[in-house]
């Protein structure tokens, strides 16, 4: 398990705990928001190191259109960079190819309906 997965799991656990407590503890909510902001800042710092300027702007546009897909791409980029499997900085052309592969891996299977007439 890599550090990003551990942080993500810990963040989810804290969010679940905060939901259980509800709005009763504003200090815990503030602390959780602060930790989430730190996590986002750290993620953006890593992405700035990994991606070229063009690739970052492409990722920002994707984030506006498909936030969940962009989040998934960010996590995969960070994991690949930590494993040393990415050229740094990542060019826009390489990033486009990587996006195509990620999209192909995650696209839903096409369902076909066949109508047989008698």
From Swiss-Prot:
InterPro entries: DNA_bind_arc, PDCD5-like, PDCD5-like_sf
UniProt biased composition (Low complexity): 24-33
Region described as Disordered: spans on this chain: 1-33
Organism domain of life: Archaea
Keywords of the record: DNA-binding
Sample GO molecular function, one term: DNA binding
Residue pairs linked by disulfide bridges in the UniProt entry: none
Bias (Basic and acidic residues): 1-12
Cellular component GO terms held in the UniProt record: cytosol
Family: Belongs to the PDCD5 family.
Protein name, per record: DNA-binding protein MmarC6_0793
Organism, scientific name: Methanococcus maripaludis (strain C6 / ATCC BAA-1332)
Lineage of source species: Archaea, Methanobacteriati, Methanobacteriota, Methanomada group, Methanococci
